Amino acid sequence: MNLVVDSYAWIELFLGTAKGERTRRLISEADEIRTPDIVLAEISRKYHREELDPQSLRARLETISSTTIVTGIDMDLAVRTGPIYLELVKKAKRGRLNSPSLFDAIILATAREYDSSVVTGDEHFRGLPETIFLH
Protein backbone atom coordinates (compact mmCIF):
# COMPACT_ATOMS: atom_id res chain seq x y z
CA MET A 1 0.00 0.00 0.00
CA ASN A 2 1.27 3.47 -0.93
CA LEU A 3 0.32 6.51 1.14
CA VAL A 4 0.29 10.27 0.90
CA VAL A 5 0.07 11.81 4.37
CA ASP A 6 -1.53 15.23 4.68
CA SER A 7 -1.16 17.94 7.33
CA TYR A 8 -4.21 16.79 9.28
CA ALA A 9 -2.78 13.30 9.76
CA TRP A 10 0.69 14.53 10.72
CA ILE A 11 -0.70 16.96 13.29
CA GLU A 12 -2.82 14.21 14.85
CA LEU A 13 0.28 12.00 14.99
CA PHE A 14 2.28 14.74 16.74
CA LEU A 15 -0.59 15.32 19.19
CA GLY A 16 -0.61 11.62 20.07
CA THR A 17 -4.35 11.22 19.51
CA ALA A 18 -6.13 8.01 18.50
CA LYS A 19 -6.20 9.35 14.93
CA GLY A 20 -2.48 9.96 15.21
CA GLU A 21 -1.88 6.40 16.40
CA ARG A 22 -3.85 5.11 13.42
CA THR A 23 -1.69 7.31 11.18
CA ARG A 24 1.46 5.89 12.79
CA ARG A 25 0.20 2.33 12.25
CA LEU A 26 -0.67 3.01 8.60
CA ILE A 27 2.77 4.52 8.01
CA SER A 28 4.49 1.53 9.61
CA GLU A 29 2.57 -0.87 7.36
CA ALA A 30 2.93 1.09 4.09
CA ASP A 31 5.20 0.18 1.21
CA GLU A 32 5.85 3.77 0.17
CA ILE A 33 4.98 6.98 2.00
CA ARG A 34 4.99 10.44 0.46
CA THR A 35 4.38 13.89 1.86
CA PRO A 36 3.96 16.82 -0.54
CA ASP A 37 6.37 19.64 0.31
CA ILE A 38 3.46 22.04 0.75
CA VAL A 39 2.39 19.95 3.76
CA LEU A 40 5.66 20.96 5.44
CA ALA A 41 4.74 24.60 4.81
CA GLU A 42 1.21 24.10 6.18
CA ILE A 43 2.57 22.50 9.33
CA SER A 44 5.12 25.29 9.75
CA ARG A 45 2.37 27.89 9.42
CA LYS A 46 0.20 26.14 12.01
CA TYR A 47 2.96 25.79 14.57
CA HIS A 48 4.19 29.36 14.06
CA ARG A 49 0.66 30.58 14.79
CA GLU A 50 0.72 28.49 17.97
CA GLU A 51 4.19 29.83 18.82
CA LEU A 52 5.81 26.42 18.99
CA ASP A 53 9.52 26.81 19.62
CA PRO A 54 11.69 26.58 16.47
CA GLN A 55 13.58 23.48 17.66
CA SER A 56 10.37 21.51 18.16
CA LEU A 57 9.06 22.63 14.78
CA ARG A 58 12.29 21.60 13.08
CA ALA A 59 12.22 18.23 14.86
CA ARG A 60 8.69 17.56 13.60
CA LEU A 61 9.56 18.54 10.04
CA GLU A 62 12.67 16.34 10.21
CA THR A 63 10.50 13.44 11.38
CA ILE A 64 8.37 13.86 8.28
CA SER A 65 11.40 14.23 6.00
CA SER A 66 13.15 11.17 7.40
CA THR A 67 10.01 8.99 7.43
CA THR A 68 8.59 9.82 4.01
CA ILE A 69 9.55 10.83 0.52
CA VAL A 70 8.94 14.59 0.33
CA THR A 71 7.63 15.38 -3.14
CA GLY A 72 7.54 18.69 -4.96
CA ILE A 73 5.43 20.16 -7.71
CA ASP A 74 6.63 19.67 -11.25
CA MET A 75 4.97 20.79 -14.47
CA ASP A 76 2.97 17.58 -14.92
CA LEU A 77 1.62 17.69 -11.37
CA ALA A 78 0.75 21.37 -11.79
CA VAL A 79 -1.24 20.59 -14.94
CA ARG A 80 -3.14 17.76 -13.19
CA THR A 81 -3.86 19.90 -10.13
CA GLY A 82 -6.17 22.35 -11.95
CA PRO A 83 -8.96 19.92 -12.85
CA ILE A 84 -8.60 18.15 -9.50
CA TYR A 85 -9.13 21.48 -7.74
CA LEU A 86 -12.33 22.04 -9.74
CA GLU A 87 -13.46 18.51 -8.86
CA LEU A 88 -12.94 19.27 -5.15
CA VAL A 89 -14.79 22.60 -5.45
CA LYS A 90 -17.83 20.82 -6.95
CA LYS A 91 -17.68 18.17 -4.25
CA ALA A 92 -17.46 20.85 -1.55
CA LYS A 93 -20.50 22.68 -2.93
CA ARG A 94 -22.53 19.45 -2.99
CA GLY A 95 -21.49 18.76 0.59
CA ARG A 96 -22.03 22.37 1.68
CA LEU A 97 -18.41 22.70 2.75
CA ASN A 98 -16.14 25.71 2.50
CA SER A 99 -14.02 25.84 -0.63
CA PRO A 100 -11.05 23.49 -0.55
CA SER A 101 -7.56 24.90 -0.59
CA LEU A 102 -5.25 24.57 -3.55
CA PHE A 103 -3.09 22.53 -1.16
CA ASP A 104 -5.88 19.92 -1.02
CA ALA A 105 -5.81 19.60 -4.80
CA ILE A 106 -2.01 19.24 -4.81
CA ILE A 107 -2.24 16.51 -2.16
CA LEU A 108 -4.89 14.61 -4.14
CA ALA A 109 -2.98 15.05 -7.40
CA THR A 110 0.12 13.64 -5.70
CA ALA A 111 -1.85 10.62 -4.46
CA ARG A 112 -3.19 9.96 -7.94
CA GLU A 113 0.24 10.42 -9.50
CA TYR A 114 1.76 7.76 -7.25
CA ASP A 115 -1.27 5.42 -7.05
CA SER A 116 -1.56 6.14 -3.34
CA SER A 117 -4.19 6.63 -0.67
CA VAL A 118 -4.43 9.95 1.18
CA VAL A 119 -4.39 9.66 4.97
CA THR A 120 -6.50 12.54 6.28
CA GLY A 121 -9.40 13.69 8.39
CA ASP A 122 -10.12 16.66 6.12
CA GLU A 123 -13.79 16.64 5.10
CA HIS A 124 -12.90 17.68 1.54
CA PHE A 125 -11.46 14.18 1.03
CA ARG A 126 -14.27 12.19 2.68
CA GLY A 127 -15.80 9.68 0.28
CA LEU A 128 -13.08 9.86 -2.35
CA PRO A 129 -11.81 6.42 -3.38
CA GLU A 130 -8.21 7.45 -2.64
CA THR A 131 -8.98 8.43 0.95
CA ILE A 132 -8.21 6.66 4.20
CA PHE A 133 -10.37 8.85 6.41
CA LEU A 134 -9.37 9.28 10.03
CA HIS A 135 -12.41 9.29 12.31
Where are these regions (language model features)?
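Active-site-proximal, substrate-binding regions of enzyme catalytic domains
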Residues: 42-87
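A generic structural signal for short hydrophobic patches within well-formed alpha-helices
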Residues: 10-11, 40, 125-126
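Active-site neighborhoods of divalent-metal-dependent phosphate/nucleic-acid chemistry enzymes
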Residues: 70-117
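Histidine- and aromatic-rich ligand-binding microenvironments
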Residues: 5-6, 35-36, 100-101, 122, ...
